[in-house]
């Protein structure tokens, strides 16, 4: 009985932190192969190494971070293991890339968003399907999901073969303001993480989704380094603030402007 009570208390403590047990594994645990059909990997024609992630939002469009822009991008869809391909994996290249700023620049707290139109639409399959854009902004206190092929250790760079997933908490923007003193008073970014540390998005997770209630609410942008430090949440581009711009571009209004 004592053992059962101890185990129960540990479980409650674990759930209260909204994180999975891991010895400072930044990305959490291996994602279920069927839970991320919208997650895409980016590499270049010269290198097969994944350097960023992105999100399929319909059969012809991918959403990622502006900092993930490169020449000769290759977009891999339906991928789980880098070394054991899925039968339905597909590769695409960009037809067009859209940014909030014509100079393709961004700041650490603003406009870190890139919309990619694929040269050919993808075919939905077991491991390929889009994720919905947000219908409303996320609420403070929400438990949201992050995922990607980013490093899974804090002391050195260790890239996994498969994407890792973890749950983190949505905080008020003021929490990040107190940590990162140069943040402006207002920003189109979201503040999310685990205050106890140990769970975080990190290098190569950039551009990937922050998922709340089954919708993409954020794009991995930046945070403290080393990653997963206590009391240092990360910043995510607030997708809801850019929804009108995204939908206008997809509808054919390529001169649409981002919110100021």
UniProtKB/Swiss-Prot annotation:
N-glycosylated. The toxin exists in multiple glycoforms. Keywords: Blood coagulation cascade inhibiting toxin, Disulfide bond, Glycoprotein, Hemostasis impairing toxin, Pharmaceutical, Secreted, Serine protease homolog, Signal, Toxin. GO terms for biological process: proteolysis. Residues 1-18 form the signal peptide. It comes from the Eukaryota. Residues 172-186 are annotated as: Key residues for binding to FVIIIa. Disulfide bonds join 31-165, 52-68, 100-258, 144-212, 176-191, 202-227. Residues 19-24 form a propeptide. Glycans are attached at residues 123, 253. It is found in: Secreted. Expressed by the venom gland. GO terms for cellular component: extracellular region; secretory granule. The keyword Hydrolase does not apply. GO terms for molecular function: serine-type endopeptidase activity; toxin activity. Residues 25-251 form the Peptidase S1 domain. Negative results: does not hydrolyze fibrinogen, prothrombin, FIX, FX and protein C. It does not induce platelet aggregation or agglutination. It does not bind to platelet phospholipids. It does not bind to factor FXI and FXIa, FXII and FXIIa, kallikrein and thrombin. This is the first member of the serine protease family that has strong anticoagulant activity and lacks enzymatic activity. It inhibits activities of three blood coagulation complexes: (1) prothrombinase complex (composed of blood coagulation factors Va and Xa (F5 and F10)) (IC(50)=164.1 nM), (2) intrinsic tenase complex (composed of factors VIIIa and IXa (F8 and F9)), and (3) extrinsic tenase complex (composed of tissue factor and factor VIIa (F7)). Belongs to the peptidase S1 family. Snake venom subfamily. This is Vaa serine proteinase homolog 1.
